[in-house]
Every structure is written in C-alpha cells, then in structure tokens.
C-alpha cells in the first residue's frame, strides 16, 4: 500500500481556516445592518435583542479567532509530519475549550434569542468531538513512543 500524500487536503483546510476568519470579520461588520433588518422583519426581535446579539457575537470572536489560529498551527504541524505530538494535544484542548466557551456564551443569551440555542448545541457538540479526538491523540502518543523504542 502506498503512503498517502495529504498535502493537498491540508492546504485546502488551511485555506478554509483563513476563509472562515475572513467571514467572521465580515460578520463583525455585517451584524450592525443585519440586526436593523431583523428588527424590521421580525416583530419579536427588538433593540435589546440586537444589542444582545452583537455582544454575543463579539464575545464569541475571542475564542473563535483563538480556535482558528490553533487550527492553522495544527494543520502546519500535520503538514510537517508532526502528528502524534503533545503540542498537538494542547492545541486540540484549546480548540475544544474555545468551542465550549462559545457554547456557554450562546446558552447565556439563549433565553432571549432562542435561535442561539442551536448555535450553542452545535458549538458544544463540536467541542465534544474535538475533546474525544484530543483524548485519542493523548493515548496514541505513549503507544507511538513505545513502538519507536521497540523498533
């Protein structure tokens, strides 16, 4: 069986990380006119909801950009062939914590803006998946070290 070359996939993933970063920046700007449209179109969406939505978005930006940075570093490590390394486990841990922070922020705003409950659910589920992958990586590192010593 030939070894796979995932350089193309890693490059696409890195490009998508940067695209998502750009989209977050666009959303940071677009939330102002978008919230005005929502107040006109949805009768249940008032000025207080618009402020809460903006606060929620800007608070979630901090873990969001940290998450994107960690994903980019992780992809660079994978491109270099550094897969089962403790620094990748740390990056995965930070990524999962960022997901959980976004989940908590959206849950806090959920009683007022119900649709943020779906965002909270998605962020929490993503955090759980990344946390499980982190646990797999952390178990694989000692196994790899033991295998390296055996060979």
Residue ranges of each PLM-predicted region?
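Alpha-helical transmembrane segments of multi-pass membrane proteins
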Residues: 22-35, 127
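Short, aromatic-rich membrane-interface segments at the entry and exit
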Residues: 112-124
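Cytosolic juxtamembrane helix and N-cap/initiation of the first transmembrane helix
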Residues: 1-27
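Helical transmembrane-bundle signal
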Residues: 17-28, 64-70, 100-106
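Hydrophobic alpha-helical transmembrane segments of integral membrane proteins
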Residues: 90-115
């Amino acid at each position: 069986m030939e070894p796979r070359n995932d350089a193309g996939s890693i490059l696409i993933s890195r490009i998508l990380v940067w695209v998502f970063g750009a989209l977050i920046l666009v959303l940071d700007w677009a939330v102002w006119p978008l919230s005005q449209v929502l107040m006109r179109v949805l009768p249940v969406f008032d000025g207080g909801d618009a402020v809460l939505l903006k606060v929620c978005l800007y608070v979630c930006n901090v873990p969001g950009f940290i998450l994107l940075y960690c994903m980019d570093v992780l992809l660079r490590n994978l491109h270099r062939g550094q897969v089962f390394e403790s620094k990748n486990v740390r990056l995965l841990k930070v990524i999962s914590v960022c997901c959980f922070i976004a989940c908590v922020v959206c849950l806090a705003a959920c009683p007022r803006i119900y649709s943020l409950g779906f965002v909270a659910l998605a962020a929490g589920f993503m955090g759980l998946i990344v946390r499980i992958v982190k646990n797999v990586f952390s178990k694989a590192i000692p196994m790899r070290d033991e295998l390296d010593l055996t060979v």
